[in-house]
């Protein structure tokens, strides 16, 4: 499978894009991830960005069977991106707002929210080495729960290996830190009340975001287990594909750069924005 993408529509207008990503990919979650991939293929055979965690909740992902499975996904046309290192955030929140963000918005998994620059640099480097050892190309880094704190942001900007990162609402083109509005449809399935709430919210957000240049669908390992949730995002995926071109995040960034060079469509973003989801 290869992404069939173009920078502009036949009418000469900017192409509208859809980027589908699968978060939290690791040996412990891989069986559930495969179910999500199967559910995506029920709708369409599109390229995904798989967000890989090197040591998910402390469990090393450098396992031959898992690495072979991920290499097969790469060969099938999917992109691999680094997604944190441990995917856990054991640090104590600094205040009530920080507690809400790191313990309620996400269940203690915002690993890169409170790291110092040195800590973040070390984890980014270790993750990059694991990718290199497997011969996996690496263009992007996405912080767990999209929570990228000030120290992690500085570490990311200081390394020249990254082409993009993303928050909950933006795609950030690196190293310049150009920001692109990129609404993300994503589901929370941790509890019974979150599932129907997510379904309603994403239905509304998909309508609001119809005119956006890029729409993202951020899936997680358990998003195929609840039939109502699965059918919700499958319908939204099908609807989006009727007027958007599917591409990996790296391919979108490449196409965006090519177009922005021709048309001067670049905007800068303040580093402060990157500490927010």
Question: What residue spans do the PLM features occupy?
Answer:
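Active-site beta->alpha N-cap acidic-glycine motif
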Residues: 2-79
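Hydrophobic faces of well-ordered beta-strands that scaffold small-molecule active sites
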Residues: 18-22, 48-50, 80-83, 138-141, ...
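Alpha-helical membrane-targeting segments
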Residues: 3-4, 95-104, 178-211, 228-231, ...
